[in-house]
From Swiss-Prot:
Subunit structure: Interacts with PAPOLB.
One example GO MF annotation: RNA polymerase binding
Tissue and organ distribution: Expressed in spermatogenic cells (at protein level). Expressed in germ cells within the testis from day 21 onwards.
Function description: May cause the redistribution of PAPOLB from the cytosol to the endoplasmic reticulum.
Name assigned to this protein: Germ cell-specific gene 1 protein
UniProt keyword list: Endoplasmic reticulum, Membrane, Transmembrane, Transmembrane helix
Family stated for the protein in its record: Belongs to the GSG1 family.
Gene: Gsg1
Topology of this chain in the membrane: Multi-pass membrane protein
Amino acid sequence: MAKMEFQKGSSDQRTFISAILNMLSLGLSTASLLSSEWFVGTQKVPKPLCGQSLAAKCFDMPMSLDGGIANTSAQEVVQYTWETGDDRFSFLAFRSGMWLSCEETMEEPGEKCRRFIELTPPAQRWLSLGAQTAYIGLQLISFLLLLTDLLLTTNPGCGLKLSAFAAVSLVLSGLLGMVAHMLYSQVFQATANLGPEDWRPHSWNYGWAFYTAWVSFTCCMASAVTTFNMYTRMVLEFKCRHSKSFNTNPSCLAQHHRCFLPPPLTCTTHAGEPLSSCHQYPSHPIRSVSEAIDLYSALQDKEFQQGISQELKEVVEPSVEEQR
């Protein structure tokens, strides 16, 4: 019984670790989806001609309207600048995410934001966003399955099924997340090359949301591996106990699905009591591992109760004989 409790505690620990990793992955992926820091960089914008926002490099020269000398009565001021090459441009910071793209403004402090979906090519507009949303949805389903297994399930067979579904959902979520991240990178590169000319970045790099998304993918796959490990361990433990029963009773090899089945009807009654404590076990063969684990757990509980009653009987009988 102590061994069973240890195995149950070890399984609960693995389920808890898997749920924590899944919750961490879900939080990181949601934060990266809502962020506008996937890509950061600069935009090359022409400076206004000797405007107020230009720091310096402009000087005034008086010129006459009739083309004469500068000391005539009719004059105007002409502004000249000696800036050439990249000095004629301002490099403004920008950041872009799946929802918004924000650019620093030259006229006043602050930034101007617009929807990134409106900037992308129509053929690739919703593909990456849909994959990212499905990735988060599968993670949420996996987390709910693991949480149900951890908090509400005391049946080993039901817990085994929940672990299997959670593991499959986590693997699908991780693969879909990897595809979604790669798709968005391609969408951004296509937008940088084919998007509006007033938006195209001069240089760009990956932001913190990009790395957060890949950390989320790593946590998701780690949770999937932990859940699969837990599921495989439970199945192998059951098969090991099943094979030990074959060694104990070789006659069971012909019909191995009935090895754990007791007689069809067993009753424990006492004088003056109705036949209410009879236990009826199924006589049909076991068709799945989860059914076998359910039956094995029930038999273990029954054997434990019978062992306790036998020990009490051994303790009570000597005391009764001494009193006689």
